[in-house]
């Protein structure tokens, strides 16, 4: 899970990409919600905002704009 705009968001489905990068862990590195990890990249596919129904990434991003270079906690 991660926190964004004071809301907890659970990652329900994701894909790990074994790729080198130079970003700080937690940094959003694409507009499709790919997140830099200590080693590799996490491509989020499905998530759930607190008190909301689960959404695939396309549905979620239609209603929530998480900008590239945002550092998630």
UniProtKB/Swiss-Prot annotation:
<keyword id="KW-0808">Transferase</keyword>
<dbReference type="InterPro" id="IPR005793">
    <property type="entry name" value="Formyl_trans_C"/>
</dbReference>
<dbReference type="InterPro" id="IPR037022">
    <property type="entry name" value="Formyl_trans_C_sf"/>
</dbReference>
<comment type="function">
    <text>Attaches a formyl group to the free amino group of methionyl-tRNA(fMet). The formyl group appears to play a dual role in the initiator identity of N-formylmethionyl-tRNA by promoting its recognition by IF2 and preventing the misappropriation of this tRNA by the elongation apparatus.</text>
</comment>
<dbReference type="Pfam" id="PF02911">
    <property type="entry name" value="Formyl_trans_C"/>
</dbReference>
<protein>
    <recommendedName>
        <fullName>Methionyl-tRNA formyltransferase</fullName>
        <ecNumber>2.1.2.9</ecNumber>
    </recommendedName>
</protein>
<dbReference type="InterPro" id="IPR011034">
    <property type="entry name" value="Formyl_transferase-like_C_sf"/>
</dbReference>
<comment type="similarity">
    <text>Belongs to the Fmt family.</text>
</comment>
<dbReference type="GO" id="GO:0004479">
    <property type="term" value="F:methionyl-tRNA formyltransferase activity"/>
</dbReference>
<keyword id="KW-0648">Protein biosynthesis</keyword>
<dbReference type="InterPro" id="IPR044135">
    <property type="entry name" value="Met-tRNA-FMT_C"/>
</dbReference>
């Amino acid at each position: 899970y991660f926190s964004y705009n004071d809301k907890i968001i659970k990652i329900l489905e994701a894909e790990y990409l074994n790729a080198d990068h130079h970003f700080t862990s937690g940094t959003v590195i694409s507009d499709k919600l790919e997140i830099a990890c200590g080693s590799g990249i996490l491509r989020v596919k499905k998530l759930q905002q607190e008190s909301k129904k689960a959404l695939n990434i396309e549905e979620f991003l239609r209603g929530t704009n998480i900008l590239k270079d945002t550092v998630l906690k």
